[in-house]
């Protein structure tokens, strides 16, 4: 299904003259959008201006392909009335996102772009007709609702500056509008898109990537940066992402994390600790965290790098105090962190579905026995990275361009050669030294 975001990427800055008259007018932009979506377009047969699309909507056939809506989402077609100083001849454009203060961002032609080309402009909602038009093909797409409550079993995604500023398409692909958005890192870095990401999703929280190691004073400075740059949408949860830069002093690391969380709590938010289980066990006394902030753990642990839209419970990284589980980094093709809620906002009791772990999960040094079969009936067994690791292209290699895999990642082992294991595919160019692999059932 074609999406608005794809159309925007293709069209912004370009001009389209569909009827061959008067150059790239606003109607031509609307008609081109319809053609892109595979839909017929309505003509302006009364006044000759865009207002006819709305005023003749019951006669021109547009309602056969579009639904009338009162609350706009990205990709809806908006028709503007005759308003002096704003849209003096009426206008048609595509809603992009909320701009605040009674204005929206609209993608359209003949609104100031060179030679009438598509551009984004801020126009008051007061100039629009009471309803907009949403392509019926968008009917099953998720929409921003401002519902940020969390129930057990809900899904959410977490995003950073690696994702697009407009999360509409990302949320549609993931099947949820609920997000946790990266705001800051260390003491200087700020995302350039966290506000727009919040505007185009239903944020349940925001996160900061910590670099303070075991320095409690630095942790408090990082918390101050985070708190002073939050998006305007209100949330309950603020997260410290602590998965790197730990010091050798486990107690100092723990104190620093708690110092950060104390700052969050004193500002009126619910603090959450995010990391991977192996990193946490090696560097943090997490029992002290949950003693002060019960059920405040958001843990990451993946079975593999295949697309996963729902969790495989036999791979849950069991530990105390877990509220959310990031069960995959590939929630959609191309990569996207996806999470499941284990504890509702008002709950303190977590129930994990009981799954009998198969005997085949035991780690063996040979592939002769107790293996599993993949979809091609090729035997493999499963193991876990004991530390962050850069995989090699072949045994004993020293590649310049290496793929990074995080500690705690589960991998499939297909072949073993002289102390090296080929992982993830029987013909892959991914090799790990055996002494960095541990029994997956022990993690």
From Swiss-Prot:
Site (Important for 1,4-N-acetylmuramidase activity): 158, 185
Signal peptide from the UniProt entry: none
Keyword Protease: yes
A biological process from GO: defense response to bacterium
Regulation of protein activity: Ca++ enhances the activity of the enzyme.
Lineage: superkingdom: Viruses
Catalytic activity field: Hydrolysis of (1->4)-beta-linkages between N-acetylmuramic acid and N-acetyl-D-glucosamine residues in a peptidoglycan and between N-acetyl-D-glucosamine residues in chitodextrins
Residue ranges annotated for the SH3b domain, each copy included: 380-441
Enzyme nomenclature, EC number: 3.4.22.-, 3.2.1.17
GO terms assigned for molecular function: lysozyme activity; peptidoglycan endopeptidase activity
Active site (UniProt): 26, 91
Matches recorded under InterPro entries: CHAP_dom, Glyco_hydro_25, Glyco_hydro_fam25_subgr, Glycoside_hydrolase_SF
Record region (Acm domain): 145-344
Family: Belongs to the glycosyl hydrolase 25 family.
Function: The endopeptidase activity cleaves the bacterial peptidoglycan between D-alanine and L-alanine. The N-acetyl-muramidase activity cleaves between N-acetylmuramic acid and N-acetylglucosamine bonds.
PANTHER family: LYSOZYME (PTHR34135:SF2)
Notes on the domains: A CHAP domain is present at the N-terminus and is associated with the endopeptidase activity. The CHAP domain is responsible for nearly all the cell lysis activity. An Acm glycosidase domain is located in the central part of the protein and is associated with the muramidase activity. The Acm domain seems to require the SH3b domain for activity.
Official protein name in the record: D-alanyl-L-alanine endopeptidase
Species annotation: Streptococcus phage B30 (Streptococcus agalactiae bacteriophage B30)
